[in-house]
From Swiss-Prot:
It comes from Turkey astrovirus 2 (TAstV-2). Keywords: Coiled coil, Covalent protein-RNA linkage, Host membrane, Hydrolase, Membrane, Phosphoprotein, Protease, Serine protease, Transmembrane, Transmembrane helix, Viral RNA replication. It is an enzyme of class 3 (hydrolase). The keyword Magnesium does not apply. One of its GO terms (molecular function) is 5'-3' RNA polymerase activity. The modification O-(5'-phospho-RNA)-tyrosine is found at Y834. The gene is ORF1. This is Non-structural polyprotein 1A.
Length: 1125
């Protein structure tokens, strides 16, 4: 039994050894590629079985092994299927019996390929979510960039408007300066005219004085002559006169008016014995004299000498300071009665009878005071003081505690004759602790500051020791308030004692002040309004009134300023066309999808000619729109497709008299012309002073926003006539109102939308959190720096998007459009099209030119559709080459890192010998196949060249044997064919400073020499003996039997699969994403894709009619087809 047990243990160890060998045999199989004969076998089988169901089922497998022309094995999951074709036309597929027909080595290769495919799928699923996040971030970056561009455009517009305003201000300033210069010139001219006129008048005055002097001399001579004749007459006839013939009759009185006396001197007035009078005038005399006026204040009386000094020049004298009797007595005492007679009238010749404005005001105040006194007397006749005192007494008696507290103070106030009411107010307001201080203040009012300080100290200490917790701070603050109030009360008490205010006056003043304070506080309070969206707004009653007043003032100022400044108006030359009818030519403009013009332009014509630039088309007159109070109408023409480039004009929102712009053509209809000015709107009529010509009829009037106001009809005299058509167009082109479904609850609908948004948002956040956890888990698995970099390359970023590369730096900036290099690498022909061109005899150069022409056309179409500027795309080829080079370096780095880890990495394509920088030896005969591949570091290139020369001999290969030897270094590339290769001399070269050496056995023997900084030299050798029905591979492992002499199939690259639909067929991935990506649907209030369709049935809620799309449902509702609506 012991021996049996030992033998059993021995067999168990053999089984374990066999399992370890199988595992070692499978390690690295996913990197193995089999070249010989597989492509030809695959093409033959595809041509023979390509359209059969069995071949289709075989192609769906994850890994495929082609044994011969009739037999193949496919692996999908854990199932091994068998493809067998006993006849070419009848192949069969068995999904579960393939494992019985393959060897252990073949099964290991299939398992490795299947595992590689599953790992690739897992990697794609892991990265799909991260790629989606990157795309979303890119979209948000695009939106932010567009917003920034819009803000920049708005800033540019503001800058342009500021520049235009600055130019207008400068122009206005120049105009004002020119106007002021003209006025200054006119003023100087008038001044010179006046100077000349004054000089002429002075000359005339001198001439007149000379003439007057001459006349005076003549009069003096005549007077002397007359005096001589009088003396002679007295001597001759003197004796004849009688002594008693004296004439005692008094002279007759001569009445002289004050106006006449003003122009007569004193001597003449005394000669004719006329009494002087003062003139009733408030104007100062021209040379000297005072004006007597009434004053409202009493002033000091003036003396006669002061009056003479004051009235030596024009001045004013008040009636209160002027006492004519006293002044006359002073004058007689000084100068005598004869000299003083009439002197006061000479000094004060004028008297002002008007009253001063302040006198009128004082009289009004006196009248008001009399009325108030009268009313107060009437009120006091009803004995209201008794009623007020009684009410105050009842109020005090209503609270017995306060009454007992106030009683001593009321008695003291009555005894000391101080205001009782103010004392009661103090006792009621201040705390009990302050009552002794109030009593002390009543007796000793002069110690108010000391008393207030002691009160503050007492209240503060009381608050600190008698209160607890947060109440201490509140009580201390109250102590300060009570102290300030105590000082104010003391001052009020002193004022009341001084003015001797009665109790009634005290009560009335207290009630009025309290009501005013409370009312003002209520008017200034702030009202907080909370809106349904959660925002709050604060308003004040006074602020609201103030804002209303300010807004009204702004409106008035804006109205006053509107007429003075001509605003900038958008040009509407791109919206007008020339309209030619039978009876004349005019102007038309586009409104919506119609051309409008005046009716008299196309009168008598059913079809008119429309011209815009070089385009001339015919259009039919659809209808006319009548205008109220106008003999002319508006003609409506159909918009031809050729004039779709004409821009439409929108209706004005507000119609009022303003600066408007008329857009028309010159008389020759060659260029557009605009007229801008003030237009007066009177009802429907529009009047202006534009210099319009014949042919401007039908032109549009637009406001400063470029919106349509009216249409031009013609010229009446010097005024242009237009008509306002805003209301007429609104009534004619009414929009159809959309009906709301019956029993539709908007609030419930909004609640569903909000709830759905919250649910979808929560799901997105949950999925995002799960993805973050997975990424963090992958990061933790990275042990070394190479592992971390590798994970970052595969899972963290898209390939080539690292910041250390050129493509990574390009990735930092959001790419707004594709480059030309993308299109110049695009595949334009399918395999069938390419094959057809070859069959038709096209050469390779002709096919290449045709493909390049298609690529150029695709690039131009892309630029036109996406508004991309192709300027600067001349260097697209250099950029494409540089990008490919950088991507190739990244691929090589990833491959090396993954080979070091012993993990799978799917290559994009096979690398050439030059790109690999290595030595590759291949020799194949009918009996044997040998390969050797050696990759070394740069410092071992010289040793690699010597080894290549030793391995490649000068002997030619025998018939039936093929050999290829390739060497690729930085400075040398060699390719030798048809020479015998000595594989025994192909050995691995140790790397400088070798740390360790590894040998990985298997079907291909791999030797790795590792040095510092993870530098490696790798040698891979394989020797396969081909016999009939058996393939022997020399390595450190046992030979593996193969039942077929066909070479192993090459590892095929998996086609790209769409992450939205899973199909590997070429199609529009963007459209596929648009159809299958889930979005929030407002109609269904849920998340779904367009491919899934709407969750909520699309039907009319009124008539229950179903529709295939929401657009048809909207048409059904808007067009009024629903009979129940």
């Amino acid at each position: 039994m012991a021996q049996a047990g030992r033998s059993g243990d021995a067999f168990a160890s053999l089984d374990q050894r066999r399992e370890r060998q199988e595992e070692q045999a499978q390690s690295g199989l996913d990197k193995v590629f089999y070249f010989q004969g597989v492509v030809e076998l695959f093409n033959r089988m595809k041509i023979a079985y390509g359209r059969t169901p069995a071949w289709t089922a075989l192609m769906k497998c994850n890994a495929i092994y082609l044994k011969d022309f009739k037999t193949a094995v496919g692996v999908e999951g854990t199932r091994y299927g068998l493809f067998f074709a006993e006849e070419v036309t009848k192949p069969t597929w068995s999904p579960d019996i393939g494992a019985n027909l393959i060897t252990l080595g073949e099964k290991a290769c299939l398992d490795a390929q299947n595992a590689k495919y599953e790992r690739l799928q897992a990697s794609l699923k892991t990265t799909s979510g991260l790629v989606h996040q990157v795309m979303e971030k890119t979209r948000e970056a695009k939106e932010n960039l567009e917003k920034a561009n819009k803000i920049q455009e708005q800033l540019d517009k503001v800058i342009e408007s500021n520049k235009a305003l600055h130019r207008k201000i400068q122009e206005r300033n120049r105009e004002k300066m020119q106007e002021y210069m003209v006025r200054l010139h006119n003023t100087q001219k008038d001044r010179d005219d006046w100077v000349q006129r004054c000089s002429r008048l002075e000359q005339e005055n001198v001439t007149l004085q000379k003439r007057l002097k001459e006349k005076e001399n003549a009069l003096v001579s005549v007077g002397w002559d007359l005096l001589g004749w009088i003396v002679i007459s007295v001597l001759v006839f003197g004796l004849i006169s009688l002594a008693d013939a004296q004439n005692l009759t008094p002279p007759a009185k001569i009445v002289i008016t004050p106006g006449q006396a003003e122009f007569m001197d004193l001597a003449k007035l005394e000669k004719i014995q006329v009494r002087k009078y003062r003139l009733d005038s408030c104007e100062l005399p021209p040379e000297k004299g005072c004006v007597l006026y009434k004053d409202y204040l009493t002033t000091r009386p003036v003396s006669f000498l002061e009056l003479m000094a004051k009235c030596s020049k024009p001045d004013w004298v008040s009636e209160s300071s002027y006492n004519e009797t006293t002044l006359m007595e002073e004058c007689i005492q000084i100068f005598g009665a004869e000299w003083c007679e009439g002197k006061l009238v000479d000094l004060v010749p004028r008297k002002c009878g008007e009253q001063h404005v302040l006198v009128n005001i004082i009289e009004q105040i006196e009248k008001t005071r009399e009325v108030v006194t009268l009313i107060y007397g009437k009120v006091m006749s009803y004995r209201l003081d008794m009623w007020i005192t009684s009410i105050f007494s009842l109020v005090l008696a209503g609270n017995k505690e306060k009454l007992f507290k106030m009683a001593p103070f009321i008695f003291v106030a009555w005894f000391l004759n101080i205001p009782v009411f103010l004392t009661c107010v103090a006792v009621n307001i201040f705390p009990v602790v302050s009552l002794p201080f109030i009593l002390f203040q009543i007796f000793m009012p002069q110690f108010v500051l000391v008393n207030a300080f002691l009160l503050w100290l007492t209240l503060t200490l009381t608050a600190f020791y008698w209160s607890e917790g947060p109440k201490i701070l509140m009580e201390i603050s109250y102590a300060l308030v009570y102290t300030i109030g105590f000082v104010l009360w003391s001052l009020g008490l002193a004022v009341g004692v001084t003015l001797k205010l009665t109790m009634v006056h005290q009560i009335l003043m207290f009630c009025v002040v309290a009501a005013a304070i409370c009312g003002t506080k209520f008017a200034c309070t702030t009202i907080t309004v909370q809106h349904p969206d959660g925002t709050t707004a604060k308003y004040t009653r006074v602020g609201k009134l103030k804002n209303n007043v300010v807004n009204q003032c702004k409106k008035v100022v804006t109205t006053l300023q509107t007429r003075g400044v001509i605003p900038a108006t958008p040009a509407k030359t791109a919206s007008i066309v020339i309209v030619e009818g039978k009876n004349g030519t005019g102007v038309g403009f586009r409104f919506m999808n119609y051309i409008l013009t005046a009716e008299h332009v196309v009168q008598g014509s059913d079809i008119a000619t429309l011209k815009n630039g070089s385009v001339s088309v015919k259009s039919k007159v659809i209808k006319t729109i009548p205008i109220f109070e106008s003999v002319d109408n508006v003609a409506v023409l159909k918009l031809p497709p050729e004039l779709n480039s004409v821009k439409p004009i929108k209706l004005a929102k507000k119609v009022q008299s303003d600066y408007l712009t008329l857009t028309a053509y010159d008389p020759n209809f060659q260029h557009a012309a605009t007229f801008t000015g003030w237009c007066i709107i009177d009802g429907n009529w529009l009047n202006n002073s534009f210099d319009t010509k014949f042919g401007n009829s039908g032109a549009p009037y637009c406001d400063h926003d470029g919106r349509l106001v009216g249409i031009h009809l013609g010229t009446q005299g010097v005024l242009s006539q237009g008509i306002v058509i805003v209301d007429a167009l609104k009534n004619t082109f009414q929009l159809a109102d959309q009906c709301r479904p019956q029993n539709f609850d908007m609030d419930e609908f909004l609640e569903k939308v909000i709830a759905g948004t919250k649910v979808s948002h929560a799901a997105i956040l949950k999925e995002l959190e799960e993805l973050r956890e997975e990424v963090q888990f992958l990061k933790k698995k990275c042990v070394t720096y190479d592992d971390y970099w590798l994970c970052q390359t595969i899972f963290g970023q898209a390939k080539g998007k690292t910041k250390k590369t050129v493509r990574g730096r390009k990735h930092l900036v959001t790419k707004r459009a594709l480059g030309k290099g993308h299109f110049m690498k695009m595949r334009m022909l399918t395999d069938e099209e390419y094959q057809n061109m070859i069959e038709k005899g096209f050469s390779a150069e002709e096919i290449r030119e045709a493909v390049n022409a298609l690529r150029e056309q695709a690039w131009l179409n892309y630029c036109i559709d996406n508004d991309v500027d192709d300027e600067g795309e001349e260097d697209w080829y250099d950029d494409m080459v540089e990008t490919d080079r950088v991507n190739q370096e990244i691929d090589e780095a990833i491959e090396r890192a993954m080979e070091d880890r012993g993990e799978f990495y799917q290559k994009k394509s096979r690398l050439t010998f030059v790109e690999q920088a290595m030595m590759h030896l291949i020799q194949v005969s009918k009996e044997r196949s040998q390969t050797a591949k050696l990759e070394v570091q740069k410092e071992n290139e010289a040793q690699l060249v010597k080894m290549f020369e030793r391995c490649v001999t000068d002997e030619n290969t025998p018939e039936g044997t093929t050999s290829i030897a390739a060497l690729s270094t930085e400075d040398d590339v060699r390719l030798v064919e048809g020479k015998v290769i000595d594989f025994t001399k192909a050995k691995n070269i140790p790397v400088d400073g070798e740390i360790r050496r590894e040998i990985i056995p298997g079907t291909k023997c791999t030797e790795i020499s590792t040095g510092p900084e993870n530098k490696k030299n790798i040698l891979k050798k394989k020797d396969t003996h081909i016999a009939e029905g058996k393939v022997e591979t020399k390595s450190s492992q046992q030979p593996v039997d193969v039942k077929d002499d066909k070479p192993v199939a090459l590892e095929q690259r998996k086609p790209r699969a769409c992450k939205w639909c899973g199909s590997s067929q070429k199609h529009d991935y963007r459209e596929c994403r648009f159809q299958r990506e889930k979005r929030f649907c407002v109609y269904c209030a849920a998340m779904h894709s367009m491919f899934e369709g709407h969750i909520r049935p699309i039907e009319c809620t009124s008539c229950k009619k179903s529709f295939s799309g929401i657009e048809k449902l909207e048409d059904h509702v808007v067009s009024g087809e629903c009979q129940k609506n």
